[in-house]
A protein has these predicted regions:
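Short S/T/G/P-rich N-terminal loop/turn motif that feeds into the first structured element of a domain
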Residues: 1-59, 66-76, 99-115
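Short, conserved catalytic or adaptor-binding loops enriched in Gly and charged residues
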Residues: 36, 87-90
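A common structural junction motif
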Residues: 37, 79-84
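Short loop/turn motifs at secondary-structure junctions
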Residues: 41, 91-93
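Short, flexible helix/strand-to-coil boundary loops that buttress conserved ligand/catalytic motifs
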Residues: 75, 84-87
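C-terminal end-helix/capping segment
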Residues: 93-99
C-alpha cells in the first residue's frame, strides 16, 4: 500500500458478516459493499479477506480520501447512508472502524519488527 500523504485520510473497517462463510448471502453483501467505491471521493478502495487467526474478523475494507472534507462528503452521501442502514447494520455481526491520517515520521529503526 502506498504511503499516506499529508492531508489524506485512510478509512478502514474490519468486520464479520452475519452470513455463513462462503454463502451466497455473504457474496451478495460483499458485492453491495463493493459499490461504495463508486461514491465520489473514494480512492484506493479494497475489500480484503482476513488471513490471520489473531482475531475473529473475516474481512476488511480500506479506502482513501484526499482530505477530511472528502471523507465527510462520503459519510453523508446518500448511497453510503443507505448501505449502512439497509445492509451494514442488519448484516454485520461485529466490526471495528479505524480512520488514519499521516503521523510523525520515524527512522527505519522504529518501523522494523512489525506489529
Amino acid at each position: 500500500m502506498a504511503e499516506l500523504r499529508n492531508g489524506r485520510i485512510r478509512h478502514t473497517v474490519v468486520f464479520t458478516p452475519s452470513h455463513a462463510p462462503g454463502s451466497e448471502a455473504e457474496a451478495d453483501f460483499l458485492a453491495a459493499a463493493a459499490q461504495l467505491e463508486d461514491i465520489p471521493g473514494v480512492e484506493a478502495f479494497e475489500i480484503l479477506r482476513e488471513t490471520s487467526p489473531k482475531n475473529a474478523y473475516r474481512f476488511g475494507i480500506s479506502m482513501e480520501f484526499a482530505d477530511r472534507a472528502a471523507y465527510a462528503s462520503y459519510n453523508e452521501h446518500p448511497d453510503h447512508v443507505r448501505f449502512v442502514g439497509e445492509r451494514w447494520l442488519p448484516e454485520v455481526a461485529d466490526f471495528l472502524e479505524i480512520d488514519y491520517e499521516p503521523s510523525v515520521r520515524f527512522g527505519a529503526s522504529h518501523s522494523e519488527g512489525g506489529s
